[in-house]
From Swiss-Prot:
Subcellular localization, as worded in the UniProt entry: Cytoplasm; Cell junction, Focal adhesion
GO process annotations (BP): endothelin receptor signaling pathway; epidermal growth factor receptor signaling pathway; insulin receptor signaling pathway; lens morphogenesis in camera-type eye; positive regulation of cell population proliferation; positive regulation of GTPase activity; positive regulation of MAPK cascade; small GTPase-mediated signal transduction
Segments of this protein annotated with the region Disordered: 40-81, 346-367
Taxon lineage: Eukaryota, Metazoa, Chordata, Craniata, Vertebrata
Molecular function GO terms recorded: guanyl-nucleotide exchange factor activity; kinase binding; phosphotyrosine residue binding
Region (Mediates the interaction with BCAR1/p130CAS): 739-743
Taxonomy, superkingdom: Eukaryota
Name the record gives this protein: Breast cancer anti-estrogen resistance protein 3 homolog
Site residues, Required for interaction with NEDD9: 743
Keywords, sorted A to Z: Acetylation, Cell junction, Cytoplasm, Guanine-nucleotide releasing factor, Methylation, Phosphoprotein, SH2 domain
Gene3D superfamilies in UniProt: Ras guanine-nucleotide exchange factors catalytic domain (1.10.840.10), SH2 domain (3.30.505.10)
Residues modified to N-acetylalanine: 2
Length: 820
């Protein structure tokens, strides 16, 4: 550059400036010793332009000028002497010199070389340290805020960074863009583990990304790393590699990527969940050199590639079309957008994810709720016709907005005799509006009679999610006028078909003081030692499967799934308690279900904390309880009792028993692994409303009832505050899942009943085991004959203190341990 642009300048002519030409040329040379000594003087040099810029104010005195600033020429530097020797002035005496802008040789100007490498070299350590600190101060869920994340570095570089066993770092996968790799050293060997990335599509409009190695999945990579580092958990069972020492980066991510030449190209959408917010960019319908210019103007070295949007509406992040073929210059307007223009074919390297088929980008403010929704233009629109006007006039008649809450299940078509407004709270006669009850239907008499018989046998009919056909319940003598067989029915059958309004129960089905027990005296004190010992012996002497069968049998009776009489069905208005808990008059049943669940959880906790013997005895009791939970989950399908056991095991009074859990891992290793790897993740799935995805309905006899009844009766439960899923960021989505599960439970109540009967077909109950598992017995055992009648809130608060005292008695807290 120096030889080409400044070779024609005179060397010995007097020039009225403070610096010789060589001073300005020194800025352009990457090998000049002067430039190396004064990098700090050019920190504010911009790399975004190639034209010289004039500084405001008096010229600054540079640190390299030690001899003062006079108009007399300075001693030439070696670089200046070389230039003069190459181009002597006497050889060019006859030439005419045409100078450029007079400010070109002004010493206050700085020439900038547009060089990425020079820009990196000019960055001082203080500036890099400041940028690194800015990255580390981001949100803890942002991958860039963790120093063990090194971005896009090569595999060999990562292997050189881990030197000792336990060292680890996380980097981007260069062979599989969008994925991440954990590099660590174990047994003096560098190992690479790909972090599996799974996209869970909870609905058409919402999806989430989870990361995992083998078993448990996490919502973010920082959460995954924290779990494996904090618990010293092996990355894989085969390798046994354990990570505990992070290798931290010392420079910003962009510097690492530029240093190793691994700056990402297009298609880095894979890590959207971890990166920066999207940047709104305008689009263009022109192609050519502007595409390449826009490509080079994009910031490089980011963790994430920015998704492109159009106008003011949020584009769908799952299916963003590669906009390389269609870009919009900044000076162009959206006034002339052709309809039906055909996109150029995509190259194989481009993203081939499905995208909306409309060639016109959305520019309004209507949100995209589902990637599957495609704009439909009217058939009379001609191909290539231009739409003129503002953004709101791109479509003559905007399509209707989709429903923001997608239907989880298509409702069944209503029956001819049921109105669309019929619901559980309306027990009205089931004739269509405007239908004359006395009118005969000669053409449909036979068909209607067959429909009545079918409804009497099968139960569910019409849009109601009930097992009882309300036409039969609501029918009266006038409705029978067109039924050919109604005249032949006797009075007894007429009584059975008469409508009986459902009863609003106000008294609990649990009456501890009226409970006749063979093991308890008429009056007993709370937590009697002899009775606790006898109950523990029964629990120890029976097999885990037998105990699970007894629990299922009692649960089915409490939830009114089995052994429900016809009178009880008529008083409920439905055929199953799974339907009743979804209805307004099922409040008392919901309270009873909550009572049994909490009482059962407290009883299991007392069974563990009441072991005053050796540490091995407590570990054995814990092992037996976990085995019962496995049987309830796999063999019995009793998710209600399973959740009660998991609630007991996750109480703070139980989880703090470190010695007990350590003894369980030593003596019952397989059980401990089963609890950590299978039961806890499965319990989390249940409480997030995803059991329909992971649990086949044919294997469930008693579904998970607690989320629904707790939502409907929140003011009655203060034992544990909010549930675990209510503190989740996706609590609204989980709430919708629980409500959809409640609808499914009401519809599939008959299926649950058949599953329970099949599982308990050959069951022979033991009287004493059945008694100790009944709610009335447990209430009297825990609170005594007098305390069992006290209000729920008082009973739970007092017993919470009792459990805390028992836990501290078994394993006294250390001085540094926080209180429960």
């Amino acid at each position: 550059m120096a030889a080409g642009k400044f070779a024609s300048l005179p060397r010995n002519m007097p020039v009225n400036h403070q610096f010789p030409l060589a001073s300005s040329m020194d800025l352009l040379s990457s090998k000049s010793p002067l430039a190396e000594r004064r990098t700090d003087a050019y920190q504010d040099v911009s790399i975004h332009g190639t034209l010289p810029r004039k500084k405001k104010g008096p010229p600054s005195i540079r640190s390299c000028d030690n001899a003062g600033h006079s108009k007399s020429p300075r001693q030439s530097s070696p670089l200046t002497q070389d230039i003069i020797q190459e181009n002597p002035l006497q050889d060019r005496k006859g030439e005419n010199f045409i100078f450029r802008d007079p400010y070109l040789l002004d010493p206050t100007l700085e020439y900038v070389k547009f060089s990425k490498e020079r820009h990196i070299m000019d960055r001082t350590p203080e500036r890099l340290k400041k940028e690194l600190e800015e990255e580390l101060l981001l949100s803890s869920e942002d991958l860039r805020s963790h120093a063990w994340y090194h971005g896009r570095i090569p595999r060999q570089v990562s292997e050189n960074l881990v030197q000792r066993d336990g060292d680890f770092l996380v980097r981007d996968s260069l062979s599989s863009p969008g994925n991440f790799v954990l590099t660590c050293q174990w047994k003096n060997l560098a190992q690479h583990f790909k972090i599996n990335r799974t996209v869970l599509r909870l609905s058409e409009a919402y999806s989430r990304v989870q990361y995992q190695f083998e078993m448990e999945s996490f919502d973010s990579i920082p959460g995954l790393v924290r779990c494996y580092v904090g618990n010293r958990r092996p990355i894989s069972q085969q390798s046994g590699a354990i990570i505990f020492q992070p290798i931290n980066r010392t420079v910003p991510l962009w510097c690492l990527e530029e240093r190793y030449g691994t700056s990402p190209g297009r298609g880095r959408e894979g890590s959207l969940a971890e990166g920066r917010p999207d940047v709104v960019k305008r689009l263009s319908l022109t192609t050519g050199s502007s595409i390449q210019a826009r490509e080079h103007s994009l910031p490089r070295g980011n963790l994430l590639r920015n998704k492109e949007k159009s106008g003011s509406q949020p584009a769908c992040l799952d299916h963003v079309q590669d906009r390389k073929a269609l870009t919009l210059k900044a000076h162009q307007s959206e006034s002339h957008l052709p309809i039906g223009c055909k996109l150029p074919p995509q190259s194989p390297s481009m993203d081939t994810s499905p995208c909306p088929s409309s060639p016109v980008f959305r520019t309004g403010s209507e949100p995209t709720l589902s990637p599957a929704l495609v704009r439909r233009f009217s058939s009379d629109a001609r191909t290539g016709e231009a739409l003129r006007g503002s953004d709101s006039q791109l479509c003559p008649k905007p399509p209707p907005k989709p429903c923001k809450v997608p239907f989880l299940k298509t409702p069944p078509s209503p029956s001819p005799w049921l109105t669309s407004e019929a619901n559980y709270c309306e027990l009205n006669p089931a004739f269509a509006v405007g239908c004359d009850r006395g009118a005969k239907l000669p053409m449909q008499a036979h068909d209607s009679h067959e429909m009545l018989l079918t409804a009497k046998q099968n139960g569910p009919s019409g849009p109601r999610n009930s097992g009882i056909n309300y036409m039969i319940l609501d029918g009266d003598d006038q409705a029978r006028h067109w039924d050919p067989l109604a005249v032949q029915t006797d009075e007894g059958q007429e009584d059975k078909t008469k409508f009986v309004p459902p009863l609003m129960e106000t008294v609990s089905s649990f009456r501890p003081n009226d409970f006749e027990s063979k093991l308890l005296p008429p009056e007993n004190k709370p937590l009697e030692t002899a009775m606790l010992k006898h109950a523990k012996e029964l629990f120890t002497n029976h097999d885990a499967r037998v105990i699970a069968q007894h629990m299922l049998s009692v649960d089915c009776k409490v939830a009114r799934i089995l052994e429900v009489s016809e009178d009880r069905k008529r008083s409920m208005g439905v055929s199953s308690g799974l339907e009743l808990i979804t209805l307004p008059h099922g409040r008392q049943l919901r309270l009873d279900i909550i009572e049994r669940h909490n009482t059962m959880a407290i009883g299991i906790a007392v069974d563990i904390l009441g072991c005053t013997g050796t540490l091995e005895n407590r570990a054995g009791t814990l092992n037996k309880i976990i085995q019962v939970a496995v049987e309830l989950k796999d063999a019995m399908g009793d998710l209600y009792a399973f959740s009660a056991i998991m609630k007991a095991l996750e109480m703070p009074q139980i989880t703090r028993l470190e010695k007990t859990w350590t003894a369980l891992r030593h003596h019952y290793t397989q059980t401990a692994i089963l609890y950590e790897k299978q039961l806890k993740p499965f319990s989390k799935i249940l409480h997030e409303g995803r059991e329909s995805t992971y649990v086949p309905a044919s294997n469930v006899s008693v579904p998970l009832l607690m989320p629904l009844v707790t939502l409907m009766e929140r003011q009655a439960v203060t034992f544990e505050g909010t549930d675990m899923w209510e503190n989740n960021d996706e609590s609204c989505e989980i709430l919708l899942n629980h409500l959809a599960t409640a609808r499914f439970m009401a519809e599939a109540s008959e299926s649950y009943r058949m599953n329970a009967e099949r599982i308990l077909a050959d069951f022979q109950p033991d009287e004493e085991m059945t008694e100790i598992l009944r709610t009335e017995f447990q209430m009297r055992l825990l609170w005594g004959s007098k305390g069992a009648e006290v209000n729920q809130n008082e009973r739970y608060d007092k017993f919470n203190q009792i459990l805390t005292a028992l836990s501290r008695k078994l394993e006294p807290p250390s001085g540094k341990q926080a209180e429960l």
